[in-house]
Structures are given as structure tokens and as C-alpha cells.
Amino acid sequence: MDCSRTFIFTNDTRQGLNNISTWWRKKFTDKIKFVGVTGSNGKTTVKEMIASILCAEMSQSKVLATKGNLNNDIGVPKTLLNLRREHVFAVIEMGMNHYGELTHLTNAVRPDVAVITNIGTAHIGELGSQDGIARAKAEVIAGLVKGGTLVIEADGKYAEYLTGQYDLGSTLTFGESSNAEVRGELDQSLGKQAIKIFYGDLVIDIDWFVNGKHNFLNALAAAAVGFALNISPRAIKRGLELFKGVDGRLETVRLRSGDTLIDDTYNANMDSVCRALEYLAVQPGRKIFVFGDMGELGEFSNAMHEEVGRFAKSLGVSLLYGFGTFAKQAVLRFGSGGLHFDSRTDLLNQLRSELNGQAHILIKGSRFMQMNLFCEALISD
């Protein structure tokens, strides 16, 4: 053993890492405002939007944010250990796939503001039902400081349930409906996008450059966090206008063939697939969907993949190419225009034969399916 180094012995390295990061985070109580971000979809995007807003208010050196999606019981402690005295804000993304995980993470972070982006069906195979997912996501409330703020979607199925779980501070809601405290309108006329955000008597006009209706809702969530932290309207506007999206999330690329690739390969669950399909459906020209398996669905796997096929057909998608064991169910449900492939090469060759310079190709699947390899191949053609 190298006796010139310091060693810490522990019976549980993960718990040991959590203990050290919790101790380190406590040194910054009353010095840094902490934001915790969780939800079934949009965690990383909302985290990046919030960070952009905070950097517009202060400077990048004063804001610590989770890198990428390091949001588990290793990533969160590693992020907390990067806290430094120059930081004013910390934006910590927290994920989970089983009960108790968020309780563990949020008690380390102790957020002043916690945002639950939405509650969908991600990890339903582990948690058994959407109600179970709601209970697991509500665990983030356990770590909220007294007098903190819980930010939730006003129109979400579990808004009332989540509000009832937090009685030590306030709740701030966001959404499109009139009952949302932070309300937004998306204008996609005249070939461009703009957002109006309403909060009390305040109106903020934002030029918007990010694809997808769901990202409009993500922007409202980020703005609500900004209001909860008393960030200036100027910084909220500038931060959202500077945000240009996250790699692998509805990222559009014009191919040399003239066709448009929609790279949404970062990950996939039922809700995010449906939102991506809705975006594909409003694009001009031929609509091609390359779909890889969705993971962690357990006993719901067959039914949810079938539903993707049905939904794609109902939206007028032209072709569905499935890749993976369960994607075959989507192809069968899609019917005419659906093909299943066991070989990446065969799928790519078939896809290339369908390109005509006017198609939109959406590629999506869970991370383990490596659907990004299809995108890389098309871009390199």
C-alpha cells in the first residue's frame, strides 16, 4: 500500500461516497441556492435550460450544473463534490428507477427548489404502475428545505397528489392552462417559433429555437424555477433564447441527400416516443420512423411497443422500421409500411433506398439499442 496517500475504508463504497458528498454539501448551506431536477422526461433538458437562465443572471463560473446525465447514486455525489465557494447556484439532476433512490439523493442535495418535470411511464417495469412512479418521484420532496418551492406541471395527472405531499413550503405550477401560475403560449406562425410567458402581471416574449411541443413545456418549467429563485425577467428571456437544445434530443440534421434526419436517440420511453412522433407528424414530405426497443417496461413491454405502432400509424407516418426484439410488436401493429430488421446493415440499406431528398427520418430507441449508430451512418454518407 502506498502510505503517502490517504485511504478511506468503508463497507459500502456507494454509501461512503454519498456520506462524503453530503458532508461537503452542508458546508455550503445558506451560501448556495440548490435546485433539484427530476421527472420521467425532460430532466436533462430542463436542467440545461435552468443553468442557461442562471448563467445569464450571474456568470457561468458561479453556476454548477450536473454534467450530462450523471444523475444516479454515483453521479449526484460526484457533482456535489465539485461545489466551490465561488458558486452561487447548483442545479442537480436526479434520476431513479426504484423506490427509495430519490429519497437517498434528495437528502444529500437538500434543494431549495425542486422541479418534477412530469410523471410518465419510464421505469414502469420496475415500479409497477404510473401511480407507483408518482410515489417514487414524490420522494424528491423529502429533501426540500423548509420554506422551499416545489415546481410541478399544473395540468399533470398527479398535480393535486404532489401538492398535497409538501406542506413545509410553497408550490409553483407551470403549463398552458389558465390555472397555471407560470403560463405559456407557443406561437409557430410565420415560419418561426415564439413563446409568451405570463407570471402575475409580467409578460416575457421569447424567440424560441428548440423543436417539439414538449420542449415548450420544459421551458415553462425552467422559467418557473427562475421565478422561484427571484431571477430577473431579462435573464429568463436571455437564458431561454440562448438555449439551442441537447444533443440527441430532436436534433435535426440535413443530410447530403437533402432529406432531414431527426436524431432523438438519447433515450426512449413511451411518453418521449409519442412526443417525438407528434413532432415528426407535422413535418412535410415522407415520414419515416426507425424505432428501437424501449427498456425497463417489464410485463408492459409488448403492449407498449404495440401502442407505438398504432400511434405512429394514426399520425400518418409513412414507414416504420423496427430494430430489436420488442420493436417487432410495433411493426406488426403498424401493418402496411412496417418492416422489422435483425441486422443494422440491412436496415440501413433499406432506409437509404427510400430516401428521395424530401423525407424526414426520426430515429429513436433506448440507449442500450445504440440507435445513434444509424444517425452516424446516415450523416457520413
What is the meaning of each model-derived region?
Residues 37, 247-249, 368-374:
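ATP-dependent carboxylate/acyl-activation modules
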Residues 89, 113, 221, 356-364:
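Short SAM/SAH-binding signature in class I
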Residues 246-248, 265-337:
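Active-site beta-alpha connecting loops in nucleotide-dependent enzymes
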Residues 8-12, 338-347:
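Short acidic-hydrophobic, aromatic-tinged amphipathic segments that line or gate anion-handling sites
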Residues 9, 15-154, 160-169, 226, ...:
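Phosphate-binding loop of NTP-binding sites
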Residues 2-5, 32, 115-260, 285, ...:
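Acidic, Mg2+-coordinating active-site environments of NTP-dependent enzymes
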